[in-house]
Amino acid sequence: MAERANLFFHNKVIDGTAIKRIISRFIDHFGMAYTSHILDQVKTLGFHQATATSISLGIDDLLTIPSKGWLVQDAEQQSLILEKHHHYGNVHAIEKLRQSIEIWYATSEYLRQEMNPNFRMTEPFNPVHIMSFSGARGNASQVHQLVGMRGLMSDPQGQMIDLPIQSNLREGLSLTEYIISCYGARKGVVDTAVRTSDAGYLTRRLVEVVQHIVVRRTDCGTTRGISVSSRNGMIPERIFIQTLIGRVLADNIYMGLRCIATRNQDIGIGLVNRFITFRTQPISIRTPFTCRSTSWICRLCYGRSPTHGDLVELGEAVGIIAGQSIGEPGTQLTLRTFHTGGVFTGGTAEHVRAPSNGKIKFNKGLVHPTRTRHGHPAFLCSMDLYVTIESQDIIHNVTIPPKSFLLVQNDQYVESEQVIAEIRSGTYTLNFTERVRKHIYSDSEGEMHWSTDVYHASEFTYSNVHLLPKTSHLWILSGGSCRSSIVPFSLHKDQDQINVHSLSVERGYISNPSENNDKVKHKFFSSYLSSKSKKKSRILDYSDLNRIICTGFIYPTILHENSDLLAKRRKNRFIIPFQSIQEKELMSHSDILIEIPINGIFRRNSIFAYFDDPQYRRKSSGITKYVAIGVHSIVKKEDLVEYRGVKEFQPKYQMKVDRFFFIPEEVYILPESSSLMVRNNSIIGVDTQITLNTKSRVGGLIRIERKKKKMELKIFSGDIHFPRATDKISRYSGILIPPGTVKTNSKESKKVKNWIYVQRITPTKKKSFVLVRPVLIYERGDGINLERLFPPDLLQEKENLKLRIVNYILYGNGKPIQGISNTSIQLVRTCLVLNWNQDKKSSSIEEARVYFVEVSINGLIRDFLRIHLGKSRISYISRKRNDPSGLGLISDNGPDRTNINPFYSIYSKTRIPQSLKQNQGTISISTLLNRNMECQSLIILSSSNCFRMDPSNGVKSYNVIKESTKRDPIIPIRNLLGPLGTTLQIANFYSFYHLLTHNQISVIKYLKLDNLKLKQTSKVLKYYLMDENGRIVNHDPYSNNVLNPFKLNWYFLHHNYHHNYCEETFTIINLGQFICENVCMTKNGPRLKSGQVLIVHADSVILRLAKPYLATPGATVHGHYGEILYEGDTLVTFIYEKSRSGDITQGLPKVEQVLEVRSIDSISINLEKRVENWNECITRIVGIPWGFLIGAELTIVQSRISLVNKIQKVYRSQGVQIHNRHIEIIVRQITSKVLVSEDGMSNVFSPGELIGLLRAERAMRALEEAICYRTVFLGITRASLSTQSFISEASFQETARVLAKAALRGRIDWLKGLKENVVLGGMIPVGTGFKGLAHRSSQHKIIPFKIKKKNLFAGEMRDILFHHRELFDSCISKNFYNISEQSFIGFNDS
């Protein structure tokens, strides 16, 4: 009893790990037999207790953690703020994803940590709680899912799903959560089965590689070791102890002068504790890596056996044990299909918190600003940073380690427990990371702009791949785009030189919205096909069109510096290239000609433009026939038409007939002297020779007429009929017959499908006959009405101007039309006739002035057509065309006419179909320069895309203007607004042409060269301004609005004030500036929307809505500046590193990747570079032979340690403990081969041969010459196929190939491993009893040692060739163990 009183009593819970420790202590202390008795008693005790407790599990035992509600709420709040920041453009998509995952991961972890204390306090014997750490059933993670929250899931690829499951299994999941949990769960039968088979196959390959590794000797005599040190704190103590226990020291350990451990001593727990206490120098230990043998291992390099705690015995098959101990946990762990969501295996970063309230101070020189991986601004410390926090009575000092983020600013007031810094976690570098591409897609359609310079890699100059050099925003400016459904136009003048590429414009189909008005949502231009629809849809109220201003459909030629656009004005005719697709057939090219009289004055009813429809164009000659209803010329004087240099007078006939007929014929005009090869009234076929150098293009009847000095030869195609009686012929001469039945004689009648023309021909001698000729019918409705091109209210000035569309035939009824060779004949011309109302005001106006105005913006020259009623003086400003200011016209209109819109581009006023009412808005044309192809489209800026913000009285500028108005009341406030767009190249604003100038002067040059006072410049500059209604207002001469091109602000100047004073008026908002949402513009609070400033008003700002996307350096931007993107287009691609999920089911593929040495980024980036650099440096320093040796050695050592760490990391993250030596044995096998390289050919090995590293070293020593080789990592599969035994290889994979190769090479298998002997049914050469078996015969013991000495070199050579140290004796006799070990070692080391 006295003894029992002295015993300690421990009142502690013993879990699985504690029991393991106790057992190992028992074994150390009492030995195996005694321990097993104790454990039996513990087992019985356990069963008794379990029976007495009778634990059962009910649903009431699942108690939810009380703090869950507010933790989840807090996380949701953080996510909401994050979402806002992303919307404002402060954080990009990846930072948002990372941060949201970390928020939820942290929440889930807090809940998990709360779980155990909660159970301990409320119900310590809760069965769920007991199970959670018993180790037998489940673990804390599973219980956490039952009573905490299920948390983040990852999909089958191991990617995180950023929507967490907030419920736990006790509460039940919502439908969405259930689907996510199915998607991320690993409970699928197939999944488990597949993964189990994977793990099994991994085990098989591992065993295959190392099955022949057996402990054959006690000591290989190596002096090398691997040093392990816990001094720098890189290795946690637990792992340090695990690494050391059971190993053998490679060197003596000294403490000062005293030796505390000797070489070849094995390390127990006592020795490890002594090392930790004394903090000795790095400890050098022996590992399987350092063993000098090739195909076996010695006892000291292996260390203690895990089974009994002593040195491993000879004959132990340690290879197979190693393979199984790595593969088996995988097999077991695939069955643990729960998913912990532990993507961030490194955990969240540690935080440094302020100890008390106070002001923080640090040295600014030691930090530099950066962004954290969550997108927050922070300072990065490059070295240890000392931070002081001064509160009222005490000063705290905090040291922040290097590479940490400081989250506060200097002199900032911090509160107690506020996070002031974030320390990167130590395991950060060991994480499995992978580089991932993430594409960001556009949410809305619009136009792309960026706010920084962009790198164009030289090979990508014309492509749309751009790299961002610094963090910046990409903006998508809103606006629906619309392909013009009408033909694209150009107002290039006749004979202008144009870029070739500028004509390659996408052509849209012409649709008819009057039929399907509701369906055509995105066709912008309507085509009016009938005059009825024109009347119905007339716009009576001009205000409907207010916002639809388009600045001219011009092919935008982007003028490069070296190309001048030259114009030769000839006869004042302007050509609009026109091409349409009709019936999916490309018509031939045709132009719209706008003829403007040289004096620029149009009378009433004069033809303003005409268009030759290609449908009415014929290659052949012929006759037109129609029923004349009323034919009169439009303009009384006949116009001079210039036709291929031949001037002809052509009257223009207007016709009101529905159709006309064209009878084709072929006409040849030949000189009188030419010799004909055909006769008159003969019938010929196609391609008949008519004269020596002409052939007929059609077949038919020939008629020859001789005139003065020339012959006219006509070929009529058609059928010939010989009627019987002459009286019937008279009916059929020179008339058109409609489709129907034609009686040729009484007996037979012929059905005619088409119109025919019947002509009577009477030859002189022969019988007369009738020629029936085919007829081409032209319906009037066939052609393209110019109404489609010019909508009804096109050029109206208010309601005055009228356009009438007139078709007329160029040739009279029945007149023969003769074509000049190889040119086509235009039969019908469509004209646009200009007219205007004769109301009281304008009755006196008999003429309209028309002129072009050219506006040059960013080197693009835009032409506008202006039609002006009333008398006005026009003066030309002559400039060179290549001058960027362009050619301008000044109209001296007084201020009384400001309300009349001065600019009407021909194509700028267009009617929008009713269905597009909601899309009314300003139109801007953007130019896409896309791989040498320019394509033009429109953007409709509707009122929904514009946002107007009224700053209230808080704005400084507003007050200034008010004051100035009192002093100088002439300034009307309504004119203090400016549209966006200037003569400047401001970041290539291709799309904003709203500044319409009618006196274009190169402002930049003036301001730069002359430095004129702004007051003078303001007189030179005259702008048309566009107000918020889209109306264009003439410049008001009383207000001096000056656009300062340098700051791009609008300044309001008076004569009274000095320039500097006014500079302060509007410094807040610049035109064209991008404003993010939530930016404070006024004192009264934040703005509501993000966008680009379009118009600055005196008391308000008009923005074009835009969506910002943040992009960090290195991101790839797709698309060009100013390009139009549609919803869902790829905008940016980010490349970022993310840590891979660390659960074992995804860990197994990782282990496999490492062992198969597949190049995954995380390995190859480091190792390949290391190998290359080492090889280069070392050969330079040491010289070639030693260089290869040392380089290969170092590479291999470094790589081996790296591989072991990677594999251990996966298993440790799952709480699986595998001793390093198992992994080392396998890694040693896959890294012990080198590849003989081709430079420096050696006599022994052929290039490309795989040989063992040790064998190569021995060969170099023996031959005393360099063998060039490089290190190779074989994967476990390749290593299994390149062993010394072909039987083992053939039984693994590719049996036929392996056996065939072995036969050809005459390979010998010495049956050294287990597998070969199993295959052949022999005795397995392993096992602890094997040594006794080998020692049976002793007759060879007497081989004298000196014989060996004599024959040293031969033995060495054989050793090299067979590359087995124990090989050459075993072939003579089975018992090579009889040779004394000493002689063996002596021989090898000599």
UniProtKB/Swiss-Prot annotation:
Any single GO CC term annotated in Swiss-Prot or TrEMBL for this entry: chloroplast
Catalyzed reactions per annotation: RNA(n) + a ribonucleoside 5'-triphosphate = RNA(n+1) + diphosphate
EC numbers for this chain: 2.7.7.6
Subunit structure comment from the entry: In plastids the minimal PEP RNA polymerase catalytic core is composed of four subunits: alpha, beta, beta', and beta''. When a (nuclear-encoded) sigma factor is associated with the core the holoenzyme is formed, which can initiate transcription.
Name of the protein in its database record: DNA-directed RNA polymerase subunit beta''
Cofactor(s) demanded: Zn(2+)
Keyword Kinase: no
Keywords: Chloroplast, DNA-directed RNA polymerase, Metal-binding, Nucleotidyltransferase, Plastid, Transcription, Transferase, Zinc
The record's free-text note on cofactor binding: Binds 1 Zn(2+) ion per subunit.
Function: DNA-dependent RNA polymerase catalyzes the transcription of DNA into RNA using the four ribonucleoside triphosphates as substrates.
GO BP annotation list: DNA-templated transcription
Residues noted as binding Zn(2+) in the record, renumbered to the chain: 220, 291, 298, 301
Lineage: Eukaryota, Viridiplantae, Streptophyta, Embryophyta, Tracheophyta
A molecular function (GO) term: DNA binding
Predominant location: plastid
Protein family per UniProt: Belongs to the RNA polymerase beta' chain family. RpoC2 subfamily.
Cellular compartment(s): Plastid, Chloroplast
The organism of origin for this protein: Populus alba
